[in-house]
Design a protein with these regions (language model features):
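Helix-loop junctions and terminal segments of transmembrane helices
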Residues: 38-39, 69-85, 156, 272, ...
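Hydrophobic alpha-helical transmembrane segments
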Residues: 135, 165-214, 385-393, 404-425, ...
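Signature of the first transmembrane helix
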Residues: 12-77, 101, 110-114, 140, ...
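Interhelical loop/hinge segments that connect adjacent transmembrane helices in multipass membrane
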Residues: 2-16, 189, 206-250, 289, ...
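N-terminal membrane topogenesis motif
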Residues: 1-34, 89-96, 131, 210, ...
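Membrane-interface junctions at transmembrane-helix termini in multi-pass inner-membrane proteins
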Residues: 143-167, 189, 355-386
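Transmembrane alpha-helical segments of multi-pass transport proteins
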Residues: 32, 387, 437-491, 495, ...
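Interfacial segments at transmembrane-helix termini and the short loops linking adjacent helices
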Residues: 8, 12-13, 117-137, 263, ...
């Protein structure tokens, strides 16, 4: 019976390593598609129209989080928790209830945006001409609510490959179909209509795969276990408030820019944030995959392996993100000039500020996932609330005086505030396990690379070819530093190698040669499990 169960379960769960590979593919597709999208609209449309589109996307992201009601994190955790315990009846009941609830939330989102469209247009766009666009973005928000919840259900069931493949499809069409509508009609309102259409179709695609998994679960042996839905709601409520505050904190500076200054400055500032996201895509998949796997270890009550493995993940995230962010900072001016145009180069200093500050506090990605996995989600209300307050206060004070530089400082402040609170509670709950000496060595190596690249790019002309030369040069410098400063050991490198396909044998060999040998410890239990 156990063998039969494993065979059936193999069609439901997937390996963490393959999940990481596909998650990176999905996030890379989003970054590439969005970069191409904004590249074209920056060269086709006036700066103020680019700013209005950026503001519409910001409204969509904020309102989608509001109407998701925290369900995406809640259902992801509870499905993972019951999956490892083979409580399939509880899983199926949670899936049915969550699907129905998410559809109701999506309808509520559309109705709200439809009724409030006129007031939103006058308040933030200073023109009633945007009323139709706001109504259309209401449809996109409804689709986004369902996408987030249905996608979280696939992640909770360890369906990393399916989730990622669907998101690759969504990312491509979410940006290219609206762009096609813009090319065909020449009117930006059709771009928003294209986005709304794709979001609804994408939600239906996610729902189709969720129902397929539901059908497979119905054929498995199950235990008679019930999970009261109010438990999931109680788990989700703190995440609901923290998500609202966290997302609002992320976008509030853009809203303040549009309110106090104008949409043209918002278009310029938004492009700096788009380039800043290039480094974020390197660690975003880690957060998506950590919660289900750490929730599994919480279910198995393996506290030692859980905490000590946080150390590995903190080291890997820092090793990848910090040099990437500082590399972008070094090339900030040339990137803005080549990808957006001369009018956007004023955003280079805000971009440098954002890259350095986010690098300092990037560890909060891992620590927050660890805290979520042990069901201590209430603290995210504090962290998100104070982050929002910091961004609001500094935005109102600094943006009228310093324009987008003030916006960058306000935006960056929320990273510092959020990290401070998350770090405090991660120590309190026994989640934190920073390797301070390793992080310092990574910073020294990254700063050396930053100094060299920043100096050289200031001496040579701005060309696209030179950008690729600088990127290659920075990568080579950092690879040498990894070896010299002993920035990663064999155990940690084994985790990275495990997500590199076998056909890239040369890359796997190079990666292995960069790592140093360390006496094998007892801290890599999660690492061995997720492989």
């Amino acid at each position: 019976m156990r063998i039969l169960y494993n065979l059936l379960l193999s069609g439901i769960t997937e390996s963490f390593s393959s999940g990481v590979t596909f998650q990176y593919s999905a996030v890379a597709s989003m970054f590439i598609s969005s970069s191409i999208f904004y590249f074209f609209i920056a060269h086709i449309l006036p700066v103020n129209i680019v700013g209005s589109i950026s503001l519409l996307y910001a409204i969509m992201n904020i309102m989608a989080v509001v109407f998701v009601f925290g369900l995406s994190n809640g259902i992801q955790h509870y499905l993972s928790y019951h999956l490892v315990r083979e409580n399939h009846s509880a899983i199926m009941r949670l899936m049915r209830q969550t699907i129905a609830f998410s559809v109701l939330l999506a309808l509520a989102a559309f109705i709200f945006m439809f009724l409030a469209s006129g007031k939103i247009a006058m308040l933030f766009f200073h023109s009633s001409a945007y009323t139709l666009s706001i109504k259309l973005i209401g449809i996109a928000i409804a689709g986004s609510v369902m996408i987030n919840v249905f996608g979280a259900m696939l992640l909770g069931l360890n369906q990393y490959k399916k989730y990622s493949l669907i998101y690759i499809f969504i990312n491509i069409f979410t940006y290219f179909f609206p762009l096609l509508m813009l090319f065909l009609t020449g009117q930006s309102v059709y771009l928003i209509a294209g986005l709304a259409s794709i979001n609804i179709l994408s939600a239906m695609l996610f729902l189709f795969f969720v129902y397929r998994i539901y059908g497979r679960l119905s054929g498995l042996q199950t235990k008679s276990v019930k999970e009261p839905y109010h438990n999931l709601i109680y788990y989700s409520i703190p995440l609901f408030f923290s998500s609202i505050m966290g997302t609002s904190a992320t976008y509030i500076d853009r809203i303040v820019v549009s309110y106090f200054i104008n949409l043209s400055y918002l278009g310029v500032y938004n492009f700096a944030l788009i380039i800043a996201s290039a480094a974020a895509f390197l660690v975003a998949p880690v957060s998506n995959l950590l919660i289900p796997k750490l929730s599994t270890f919480f279910s198995l009550d393996n506290k030692e392996g859980f905490r000590n493995s946080i150390r590995i993940l903190l080291n890997i995230v820092s090793l990848i993100y910090i040099p990437a962010a500082l590399g972008i900072a070094a090339l900030s001016r040339i990137l803005l000039f080549e990808f957006a145009g001369k009018a956007y180069t004023m955003a280079y200093l805000p971009l440098i500020i954002i890259m350095f500050v986010t690098s300092i506090f990037i560890g909060s990605t891992v620590l927050a996932s660890g805290i979520s996995s042990i069901r201590r989600t209430k603290i995210f209300i504090y962290s998100s609330g104070f982050a929002l307050a910091s961004n609001v206060v500094l935005s109102v004070i600094l943006i009228p005086r310093f324009n987008i530089i003030g916006a960058a400082i306000a935006y960056s402040s929320m990273n510092a505030v959020n990290f401070t609170i998350v770090y405090y509670y991660s120590r309190k709950f026994g989640v934190n396990n920073y390797d301070i000496s390793r992080i310092i060595k990574i910073w020294i190596s990254s700063l050396i690379m930053f100094g060299i690249i920043y100096t050289i790019q200031g001496l040579l002309p701005y060309t696209m070819i030179n950008i690729f030369i600088y990127i290659l040069g920075g990568l080579l410098i950092y690879l040498v530093e990894i070896k010299i400063f002993r920035l990663i050991n064999q155990e940690e490198m084994g985790y990275i190698i495990s997500v590199i396909p076998d056909r890239f044998g040369a890359i796997r060999y190079l990666a292995k040669s960069l790592a140093y040998n360390e006496k094998k410890g007892n801290y890599d239990r999660l690492f061995r499990f997720i492989k």
